[in-house]
């Protein structure tokens, strides 16, 4: 026995073989006639016992033309990267700076936070993270909200 599944409608074997001409789920007149995907569920011989196995759906694959591939590439614009810069200050303790960096920047480890804090302390500033402009501005505002001096600048890719 087989059960036909079309979209979200499952037709039991009884409706396939004992259907009336006016039945709206009749396979010859039903909603499956114009569908491109029709799956069959092979069930065991005894109805109501055991599960079934789904056969692989038949899907028509169309490969996009050369023009559409270029259109997809054009539509996917990658946001230019921006740097979040931490500036050295004389009023926040080093431990506090490490805690804020770990709290504000997702995935920031203790070792990375300590290295960034040390670089800012020694050199006057340090790159905290390079990300999209919206994320960089959000991180900068969160750092400032916690009392740290920070800024955002485009990532030029230089030293």
Curated annotation (Swiss-Prot):
Species: Arabidopsis thaliana
Annotated GO CC locations: chloroplast stroma
Residue range of the transit peptide in the UniProt record, numbered on this chain: 1-44
GO molecular function, one term: peptidase activity
One example of a Gene Ontology biological process annotation: positive regulation of proteolysis involved in protein catabolic process
Annotated function: Small adapter protein that modulate the activity of CLPC. Involved in plastid biogenesis in particular when chloroplast protein synthesis capacity is a limiting factor. Probably involved in substrate selection for plastid Clp protease system. Recruitment to ClpC chaperones is facilitated by CLPF thus forming a binary adapter for selective substrate recognition and delivery to plastid Clp protease system (CLPC).
Disruption phenotype: No visible phenotype. Weak chloroplast phenotype under short-day conditions.
Keywords: Chloroplast, Hydrolase, Plastid, Protease, Transit peptide
Family to which the UniProt record says this protein belongs: Belongs to the ClpS family.
Tissues/organs with expression: Expressed exclusively in photosynthetic green tissues with high levels in young, developing leaf tissues.
Keyword Transmembrane part of the UniProt annotation: no
Subunit structure: Interacts with CLPC1 (via N-terminus) and CLPC2, but not with CLPt1 or CLPT2. Binds to ClpF; this interaction stimulates their association with ClpC.
Main location: plastid
Pfam families: ClpS (PF02617)
Compartment(s) where it occurs, according to its Swiss-Prot or TrEMBL record: Plastid, Chloroplast stroma
Protein name: ATP-dependent Clp protease adapter protein CLPS1, chloroplastic
InterPro entries assigned to the protein according to its UniProt record, in alphabetical order: ClpS, ClpS_core, Ribosomal_bL12_C/ClpS-like
